[in-house]
């Protein structure tokens, strides 16, 4: 009973957003999710930064500490350990206009997660196709360049939830975060009852 009671107290989950390629639109996604605002040209952040937002998942308030992946995190083992070993789960984001961003998730970031993450966080992944108008895609690339059928098949083969989002239109922006928090919460409950 004590373990269940602890779970019902305030939960703080560290979420890492992977996909630092410029065309992924992570900054636009975060600004829309945390502040409710959209900007196709958000300001660059320098240094280590994270956002916090409290959401309700299955009648429980959960505080998300959201760390956008920074390409400089992998410079040293200390930064890498902080990113991967401290995470509860990952939002894997690629830009629908950039095949390279999806390829990098498969060929680089999934390898990094598998190699450096703890066993708990490896099970908590959500794949996100971001149709975000970044400076490269704004009014220049109106169609998807990444075949969503292929990405959906890949996600299904790994048992990873898949979402298509559009921060500009406020389409599906909250859902990937809610689903990831639910995965973490359910894994946390399963682990606490063992």
Curated annotation (Swiss-Prot):
One of its GO terms (cellular component) is endomembrane system. Gene3D superfamilies: P-loop containing nucleotide triphosphate hydrolases. Disulfide bonds: none annotated. Coiled coil: none annotated. The keyword GTP-binding applies. The keyword Protease does not apply. InterPro entries: P-loop_NTPase, Small_GTPase, Small_GTPase_Rab. GO terms for biological process: intracellular protein transport. Belongs to the small GTPase superfamily. Rab family. PANTHER family: LD44762P. This is Ras-related protein RabU. It comes from Dictyostelium discoideum. The gene is rabU.
């Amino acid at each position: 009973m004590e373990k269940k009671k602890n779970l019902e107290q305030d939960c703080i989950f560290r979420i890492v957003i992977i996909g630092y390629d410029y065309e992924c639109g992570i900054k636009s996604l975060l600004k829309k999710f945390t502040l409710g605002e959209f900007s196709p040209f958000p300001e660059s952040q320098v240094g280590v930064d994270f956002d916090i937002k409290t959401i309700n998942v299955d009648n429980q308030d959960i505080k998300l500490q959201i760390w956008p992946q920074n390409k400089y995190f992998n410079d040293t083992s200390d930064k890498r350990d902080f990113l991967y070993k401290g995470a509860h789960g990952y939002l894997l984001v690629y830009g629908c206009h950039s095949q390279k961003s999806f390829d990098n998730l498969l060929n680089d970031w999934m390898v990094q997660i598998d190699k450096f993450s703890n066993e708990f966080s490896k099970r908590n992944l959500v794949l996100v196709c971001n149709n975000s108008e970044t400076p490269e895609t704004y009014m220049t690339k109106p169609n998807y360049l990444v075949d969503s059928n292929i990405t959906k098949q890949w996600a299904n083969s790994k048992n990873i939830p898949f979402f298509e989002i559009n921060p500009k239109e406020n389409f599906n922006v909250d859902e990937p975060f809610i689903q990831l928090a639910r995965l973490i919460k359910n894994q946390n409950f399963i682990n606490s009852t063992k």
